[in-house]
Amino acid sequence: MWNLAGKELSSRLLLGTACYPSLEHMQQAILNSGTEVITISIKRQTSAGLDGESFWQAVKKLDCHFLPNTAGCRNAEAAINTAEIARELFDTHWIKLEVIGDDYNLQPEPFELIKATRILIDRGFEVFPYCTDDLVLCQKLVDAGCKILMPWGAPIGSGKGLINPYALETLRYRFPDITLIIDAGIGKPSHAVQAMEFGFDGVLLNTAVALANHPALMATAFRHAVIAGHQAFTGGMMSERNVAHPSTPLIDTPFWHQVNNL
């Protein structure tokens, strides 16, 4: 069990609800993942014939905590307004704060992100800020009152994994008491394992499952990956060595090498 913003959870995997081939694929993937927290975009647009009302009914049946996000917002004002709508709609003070500053890599706009964070925290929100792995930006968010940081592993939807391991490990070292969740860029279960081995508290992903050939099966794979990575970290992994070291103890010289003095 772990505590996320006052909620006791079993799963350290958070899952998005966008881009699935159908509602049925989405529901089964979420069930297979074992997640207890799903993200939902307030500005979500239905596509591929999916009915909006059917979507809401589907997610309500999943018995998960909702983490609404401000996807699509490009300044603090828009993000704050969206967060207020989300709080009223979902009856939650949780908000995944996204303020995008660039269309090419969907990198967060740091100045607007910090501005929105300060205002939302003052208004009683628990802010889950989508940010980069920049140490100074993360420190500013913590200074603004964030208890949770959600740095990217790579640009949203890229599937490139953890492109700057050093920066992510540095965040874990510098913020030992902050909840750290990798958000964006995860493409394979092995990426999730790596994030958890770094000591991150959780992983949030969407595209890697939604666009898989078999979303439900991929969700199962990520479920086990997150568990394996976390157990590896808590179990205490051996340190790397520059030279070989025998794994079998040599108590004495093998009998066939001993000199027969008889």
UniProtKB/Swiss-Prot annotation:
GO biological process: thiamine diphosphate biosynthetic process
Broad class of the protein's primary localization: cytoplasm
One GO CC annotation: cytoplasm
Class of enzymatic activity (EC top level): transferase
Localisation: Cytoplasm
Catalytic activity: [ThiS sulfur-carrier protein]-C-terminal-Gly-aminoethanethioate + 2-iminoacetate + 1-deoxy-D-xylulose 5-phosphate = [ThiS sulfur-carrier protein]-C-terminal Gly-Gly + 2-[(2R,5Z)-2-carboxy-4-methylthiazol-5(2H)-ylidene]ethyl phosphate + 2 H2O + H(+)
EC number: 2.8.1.10
Pfam families, per database record: ThiG (PF05690)
Signal peptide: none
Keyword Nucleotidyltransferase: no
Keywords, sorted A to Z: Cytoplasm, Schiff base, Thiamine biosynthesis, Transferase
Assigned protein family: Belongs to the ThiG family.
MF term (GO), any: thiazole synthase activity
Cited function: Catalyzes the rearrangement of 1-deoxy-D-xylulose 5-phosphate (DXP) to produce the thiazole phosphate moiety of thiamine. Sulfur is provided by the thiocarboxylate moiety of the carrier protein ThiS. In vitro, sulfur can be provided by H(2)S.
Name this protein carries in UniProt: Thiazole synthase
Residues the entry annotates as binding 1-deoxy-D-xylulose 5-phosphate: 157, 184-185, 206-207
Gene3D superfamilies for this protein: Aldolase class I (3.20.20.70)
UniProt-annotated catalytic positions: 96 (schiff-base intermediate with dxp)
Quaternary assembly: Homotetramer. Forms heterodimers with either ThiH or ThiS.
Source organism: Legionella pneumophila (strain Paris)
